[in-house]
A protein has these predicted regions:
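Protein-protein interaction interfaces in oligomeric scaffolds
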Residues: 1-209
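Structural detector for short beta-strands of small beta-barrel domains
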Residues: 226-241
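Short boundary/loop segments of OB/S1/cold-shock single-stranded nucleic-acid-binding domains
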Residues: 208-229
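A short, compositionally biased
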Residues: 192-194, 239-242
């Protein structure tokens, strides 16, 4: 299920629960109000069933909800903080995509960065959040490389906040220096601004409270990457001409 569909389903469930609560408070004399609320509840239940039955979208999407010091409830968010932290998330996605496709060099321009571009397509309720989606006119039948990269970036960030140390170490076994450095920047921005985060992408729905942000920032700072040489033995079968 995409981030948008999951959020729509969550909101529909919340609205249905609120309507059911109002119905429970009505007396027998509130006939017209009951008719209206029952019709609204039926519509919400149909919407939930539609969202549950919908297939998974092959394109990338992620929703980032922020709370804490930079946020004024659902009214607004500090623009400098929002721009900086969203840019860092985009950088993580770009580096994951490069690593999984053309390879991520130790320095220099990130390969195929344009292909990793996400667009802010909506402001979503629930504290203050942004919906980021893969844009394009082409229809896709199978999962796009960017969808896989966004899901992997989300899994990686999730690992830094994971309470279990062993699960964290297992999840970051293949991380490289450039990706680690960008994750470090991301969580440093979160911590220094006193921000919290809920990150929704694919099947992941992860909340980073103050404690989780602190843990993630400390791990990103203290973790180091150690390279090792590996010898692979084989036989050259031939060389293709240029």
């Amino acid at each position: 299920m995409t981030s948008l569909r999951k959020l729509e389903r969550d909101f529909a469930h919340a609205d249905a629960a609120a309507v059911a609560g109002l119905l429970a408070q009505l007396g027998d004399e509130d006939i017209m109000a009951r008719f209206g609320l029952e019709a609204r509840l039926a519509d919400l239940q149909q919407e939930i069933a539609r969202l549950d039955a919908a297939g998974d979208e092959p394109t990338a999407s992620a929703a980032l909800f922020f709370g804490g010091r930079p946020v004024l409830g659902q009214r607004g968010i500090e623009s400098e903080f929002a721009g900086t932290v969203i840019t860092k998330f985009q950088d993580i996605v770009a580096k994951v995509l490069a690593r999984e496709t053309n390879g991520l060099g130790q320095r220099g321009v990130v390969a195929n960065k344009a292909a990793s571009t996400l667009h802010i397509t909506n402001i979503v309720r629930g504290s203050f959040g942004f919906l980021l989606e893969e844009a394009g006119l082409q229809q896709h039948m199978v999962e796009t490389p960017l969808r896989a990269a966004v899901d992997e970036a989300t899994r990686l960030l999730d690992a830094f906040g994971e309470p279990d140390e062993e699960q964290f170490r297992t999840a970051i076994e293949t991380i490289d220096d450039r990706l680690l450095a960008t994750a470090r920047d991301f969580f440093d921005i979160m911590r220094s601004n006193g921000a919290t985060l809920r990150l929704v992408s694919g099947g992941t729905d992860r909340s980073f409270g103050t404690e989780a942000v602190e843990r993630a920032a400390e791990r990103a700072t203290s973790t180091t990457v150690q390279d090792s040489e590996e010898v692979l033995r084989g036989q050259l079968g031939g060389v293709l001409p240029d």
